[in-house]
Amino acid sequence: MATATVELDLRPPGPYRFPSPGRDGVLRRREGALTRVIHCPEQAVVRAWPVAGAVRLCAEAPTRGAALYATDRMRFALGLDHDIRPFVRRFRWDPLIGPILRRRPWIRPLRRPEPFEALAWAITEQLIESQRASAIQRALVRRYGRRSECGTLRDAPAPTRLAGCGQAELESCDLAAARAQALIRASREVAAGRIDLSQHEPAWERLLAIREIGPWTIESLALHGQGRDDKLPAGDVAYLKLVGKLAGLGRRATVAEVHEFFAPYEPYQALAGEYMLRASYLKGPVAGTPASPARSG
């Protein structure tokens, strides 16, 4: 039973809109508020809703420390401290992303409150369509996620829980054998403390030693779980297709060509990618080439 409540109002830097709850069933929209349960390891239920130009966070937990941790993780996940104004100012007249930057300057990458959640979900998303990946994630949450005291919310599975799973158990959630092995190995490394996801580069190096974990998984972890706007998941099929079209290649681009295409946007390659994909999906194919750093600055 919750004995501590922490409530605070935050004013996001620049234009802001709530992200969608997603399709894994962890973050819920209820009565105008985004709600989820977070463990540290104590359980906290945290809610977020708009109030007079700000966002109010309210966390209830057994201890004040757990409630504070939950609000900190929720503000990261919702991008409430994510200041993209320098990026917008620098590239607002870019021929590719300038128009959508001026129309929708609130777009931010989807984030996860815990880096392990981003890592686990990136592994489930390898080489499959998004709908199937979401179904796998929902199955993992139902089977291994930690339930809230009220019984209506579930957190994503903890690394300690997945570390104890057998390959066949994860395969029963429709995860391919190789992905199941990778998820178990990664979970064991994190649970044992051999991989510290708060230490970005050292963690990436150790994760890359695990079979079936490659650059795309690391870049997805970095962007969605570690707040790295410079880490574009360049191997994503959407980027391979988009760059192939924009660069006039007549084929899908290679990963190296995607990285080269987005190099002028450094250190905001991932932000540029988010906006470029939105421009492509919302208004049809975008046209042009990136501005040089000098011209866009």
Where is each model-derived feature located?
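HhH-family (HhH-GPD) DNA N-glycosylase catalytic core used in base-excision repair
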Residues: 1-297
